[in-house]
Every structure is written in C-alpha cells, then in structure tokens.
Curated annotation (Swiss-Prot):
Mitochondrial GTPase that catalyzes the GTP-dependent ribosomal translocation step during translation elongation. During this step, the ribosome changes from the pre-translocational (PRE) to the post-translocational (POST) state as the newly formed A-site-bound peptidyl-tRNA and P-site-bound deacylated tRNA move to the P and E sites, respectively. Catalyzes the coordinated movement of the two tRNA molecules, the mRNA and conformational changes in the ribosome. It comes from Penicillium rubens (strain ATCC 28089 / DSM 1075 / NRRL 1951 / Wisconsin 54-1255). This is Elongation factor G, mitochondrial. One of its GO terms (molecular function) is GTPase activity. Residues 97-384 form the tr-type G domain. It comes from the Eukaryota. The gene is mef1. One of its GO terms (biological process) is mitochondrial translational elongation. Gene3D superfamilies: 3.30.230.10, 3.30.70.240, Elongation Factor G (Translational Gtpase), domain 3, P-loop containing nucleotide triphosphate hydrolases, Translation factors. The lineage of its organism: Eukaryota, Fungi, Dikarya, Ascomycota, Pezizomycotina.
Amino acid sequence: MRSPSLARLQTRAVFGLTRSARFQPQTLLRQRCASTAAFRSAAVAPAYQSKLGQWDQRRNASAAASAVLEAAKVNPDGLSQTAIIDNLDPVEAARLDKCRNIGIAAHIDSGKTTCTERVLFYTGRIKAIHEVRGRDSVGAKMDSMDLEREKGITIQSAATFCDWVKKDKEGVEQKYHLNLIDTPGHIDFTIEVERALRVLDGAVMILCAVSGVQSQTITVDRQMRRYNVPRISFVNKMDRMGANPFKAVDQINNKLKMPAAAVQVPIGAEDEFEGVVDLIRMKALYNVGGSGEEIMEKDEIPEKVKAIAEERRTMLIETLADVDDEIAEIFLEELTPSEDQIRAAIRRATIGLKFTPVFMGSALANKSVQPMLDGVIDYLPNPAEVENLALDQKREEASVKLVPYNSLPFVGLAFKLEESNFGQLTYIRVYQGTLRKGANVFNARNSKKVKVPRIVRMHSNDMEEVSEIGAGEICAVFGIECASGDTFTDGTLGYSMSSMFVPEPVVSLSIKPKQSKDGANFSKAMARFQREDPTFRVSYDSESDQTIISGMGELHLDIYVERMRREYRVDCETGQPQVAYRETIGNRVEFDHLLKKQSGGPGEFARVMGYMEPTGALEENKFEQQVIGGSISEKFLYACEKGFNLSCEKGPLIGHKVLGTRMVINDGATHMTDSSEMSFKNATQQAFRKAFAESQPSVLEPLMKTVVTAPTEFQGDVIGLLNKRNATINDTETGVDEFTVHADCSLNGMFGFSSNLRAATQGKGEYTMEFSHYEKAPPHMQKELIAKYVKAQADRHKK
C-alpha cells in the first residue's frame, strides 16, 4: 500500500502548489516549482508508472506547468529559465533540447544561400547541390523566386527544416532538429532580416574571408542586438585570393565591439585551403567525398599550422577568461581548462550575448560546413533556454514570461505573410502551448476568432502537412487573415507580443497600370504586397491624382514593379523616384490666433494661444496642453491635438511630413454656441501654418550611409564619382586587391549611381546604402523645392 499512498501525497502536493501559487512569497514559490521536478522523476520510475499510469503522469506534469505559468505572471523577473527547464515534462525537455531555431544572416554576397544549400545537402534534406543564379537551370533551393535566381540575390527570407546527426562525447549519434531561415543580404530587404531575427533563438553570422566586416554586417549585428539573438560566426570564402580570417576576427572585436575568438584555424588558404584545425580538441578536420560529405579527423596537425594553432588556442582561453567567471578562475590559477570546460564556457558566453565563436571554411568548395553545424548544436540555445516576454493586456500591459510547455494555453506570433497557390500563408512561431489543426485561435489585435484549417512545415516553396506544432517550433498556417506582427492565443490569455522594428521608407515613385483594364489586378497586387511587406507603402495623392509607392530603395521598388508584371501580368508606368524630404521648425514662435466666423447662422469661434519650438532633435513631434482654469475644455483640446497632427502630416513648405516640432497650447477662449471641435481643429491648423512660416523653417533631406567596394585600380574614379555627388567621405580602407569607401551621401544625388559605378569600374564595383539621418538641405536646393511646390499648388488652383 506504500506506493499508492505516496502517489496520492505527491498528487495532492502538486495540486496544492497550483491552487496556492498566487498567494505564496516568491522565494517559496520557486522552491515549490523546483520541487515538482522530483515528482516527475518519480513519475518515470517503474513503480510509479505501474500505480499512477499515463494519465496521472500527465496530470502531475500539467499541474507543475500551471504553477510555473502562475509564477511567470506574478513575477517574471524572479522566474529563471533554469526553473522553467527543471519543471519541463521529460518528453518535452528531450524534444526541446534537440531543437534549434536559427537564421543565417550576412552582408550581400557573403555566401549565405550557398552555405544554406550545403547545410540542406549534408543534412539529407536535398539530394544534390545547386548553385546561386540558377546556372544549372535549377538554382539554389532557398532561392525559390525566378527573380532571385536571375539576379543571384535573396529577396525574401525562406524557411526550411532539417535534421542534423551529431556524435556526443561518448561517440553516440544524436539527432537534432533545425528550423532554418535564410535571409537577404541587401539593405533594401532588411525587413526580412528583422522579422526572422524577431522569432529566432540563434543565428549564424557569415563573413567574407577577404572583406571581413562590411556595412551590412554592421546592420545585421545591430539587428541581432535589438532582439538579443546569440550568434556564432562563420568566415566563408577561405578559398578566395586574399583570404585572411584573422582580420575578420579582429574586426568582429573592434568594429562590432563583440568579444570573439577563433575556435578553428585554417590549414592553408586561398587555392591551398585544405581544412581546419579544431582548437578545442586539437584535431585536423578534412572534407572527403565528391561533395565533401564526410569529415575525416586526424590527430596529427600539419607542422605549418601547429604554432598558430597553439597561439590561437591560448587566445581563445584568454578571451573566454574575460567573459566567463569559471574560465577566469582556472586561468588565474594558471591551470589548463578541459575540453568540456571550454565548450561549456563558450556556450554560456554565447547564449549570454558576451561572445561569438568564429568558425572557418568555404561553402562553395564544400569545406568545413559540418563543423559549423556542430557549433550550432553546441553553442546556440534551444527554445527553452531563451527568455521570451509578452504583455498582459488584462493587467495594463504588464510583462509576463512565456513558458515553452505544450500543456499551457497557446501563444504564437505571426511574423511573415506570403501568398501561395492555396491562399495566404502565415508563418507562426509558437512560444507557448500547442497549435493544432482545426483549433480556434484568437487574434490579440482585433479579438477575432479564426479556425486553423491547415498547418504545414515549409521547405522553401515546398511544404509538408502536420497535425500540430508544439512550443518552440516554427510552422506556416493557411486560411488565417491577419497582419504581420499579430499575436495569436487560445482566447484564455490576454497576451500580446511586441512586434518587430519597421524602418520608414526613404524613396517614393508614382505608378499606374498602362492599360485601364488591369486596374483590378493592380489593386489586388498593391494590397497583397503591402500585407506581406511592412516597408512597402501605398498611398494616394489626391492633388496629383496619382498612386504613390514607397520603399527602402530603388531596387526594392523595382522588384515590386517587376513582380507585378510577372505574377499579375500588369505592365506599369512609373514616375521618377522621389526623395522622402522632411520639414522642421526653426526658432521658437509664440502665437495667439482667433478663428471667428459669425454671420447669422451657426458660426465658428476658437481662440488658441501658446508657442511652437524645436524639440531639440529631429525626432517625433510633440503636442502639449498647459491650459489652467479650463478656458478650453478637454474635448476641444483633443481637437487641437488632432489639428496639430494633421498639420505635421503635410508641412507648409513643400508638402512633406514635419519633424522635430513641439506645440504647446496654454490658453484660449470659447464661445457658448459657436465653438466646436471642428473650429478648434481648424484654428490650430491655421495657427500652425502661421507660426511655422515665421520660425525660419527648413527642408530636411535624408543622408545615406554609403559603402562602396571596388578593385584598387578604380579608387580614383570612385572617389571622383562620390565627390560629384557632394558626398562626405568618412573613411577609406585599402586591401590587397580592393578598397572600401565609407561616405554620407544625399539620397537625392544617388539616383543613377549604380549605372555610373558599373561604368567606372567595368562592372566590378558594388555599393550599399542605408538610411543614416536627416539633415538640412543646401539653401539653393531648399529654394528650388519650395518654388517648385508653390508653382504646383498655384497650377492646381487655376484648374
């Protein structure tokens, strides 16, 4: 009778914990949460299984999970990831331990898609390797769009999944499940990187062995930091002339300010690149087979790299000592850490965002990709090790920690939308609970209930149907109408998750279909592209009667115009690209404006007093009311704010948005019958225009952080091109056979630069542009823009 009695006591203890969790002091709660691990240990013992059975085990695990969920609500900061992992159901713990959600990100042409193609081949996901640009009429698996294969660039992030078999330290093979997203490298498609990193647990940052850290590498680093994504680094293209992996390591340390150290050294370089030396185990690794399918290990390290291997191993330990306490103690005691201690330290420091281990290889030459995959398993976190927070709308958006238990209420984030032959495809990351086919889920943004008709795992443009997806996984769902960034729950929780960062567009152009019969397809395409891409905006200019599209650059908009032609068979006419200028106030100006129209019928009366001034930085506009004594009622002040916001949408100078302007209303007057919300809104707009004109306002133009790379023999020509565009050159780096120029350029002066650069460098130069900041436009340009706008307004009034 002892076992049943023990079982009853354990069950009562667990349920007692659940009922009383919200009333317990946090220290005691954590102790009790931890205590459920012992109950689960008993649950898998044979004697316990025979008495309770499978149902009781699930009930106990569910109770433990509920207690942790309650702790996640009450005090998310006090609930550690360790406590969450300790209370996982054993089956779930094993599943999550073998799962990695990773992305591959880098500067354009660093070899991301080529590397992903090898990963898919070595994991058995594809049967043959195909190259970027579709040279063999097939193209890389992850570049599924024809445009991607033709241009040799990734335009959309692509998701896939695969299994990687890795031997543990006892030599036993362990299978790991990878959810993998390949991202674009071009700055125009940066939103694809943003939304991928928003939902991933780790990343592989790829660098070119020749160029090292480049402009988009810095952008990717900033995005990884924004979402707290740990990364390992892979120095690719070791077979290229001028390859110098240690320059890349130094640049990660110095340019990215991220502690980094090589965990491998190359055996040879350029056309003599043979393999790598594993600095942790001090073994030489070579790829063998027609496509490098097998890794051959040798205990003997080639003499030519022995010295540098010893030196770099010492540097690895020294760098780890700076970021990990355990290694620091060993280092100070002048002891040598073991292999396991080094691996554990790298893992702790990498997951803690303090360090990145650097691997080396050549994806195109099929060398050293598999050791990088081992690094993904060894050093990047599983879903249970990553802290994810949501906002509880029922408790004034208080932060709550999400717990990756399948038995808990479902919470997921829609991070990407895509049109397919079967309708809208919504990519979802499941953070908590289970998403099941046929289940009802609720959109936290609009509280709409939708049914999940079909769940698939994506493999680029192919898909495999599944019945359910557990916590920590990524999937795609058909038949759900939503927007990118929407949170879905099972309806019992009022949770919503913060969305990804969406940069503002910098380039616009007018567009219309060449034939009026294509209007329906044109509208359908515009609606779809906006839904899929938050950086692609569509607006209608009533004054010019034109549809305006806005995006991150010329290439961004060109791609959508071409997609419209290919996917919807709509040929379009486009205007010249237009720069997204801004306007800003000059000096502080006080105003006292009276709007008075009283002519027998219902009149208008509103008096507003106050001042306008710069905010001190070119940032968001601010409206404040400092009215004392109730001279203007709350509803009229709300109308004043509305009038201010409308005025900022279209400035008086050239009709562009206003930045960095603050309006304060501190007094005014109303009329008993003639004052209305409309009159105060109009009065505020009139006061805004008058005060803005008196403040010596300015037109602002966007400056672009521009990086140009070309062979050294064209350096003079490239500098000349930039000088013609009044660029401010900030830095120049000269390498063995190429140079890089960093400059700030006016976006207005960069239209057509791509063609000029190709002509000046015989097609060998490349450049990237990224929005930097707004700055006052030159006086002559301001006069031209204002005169052009005034003339256009006058011409419209004549009509």
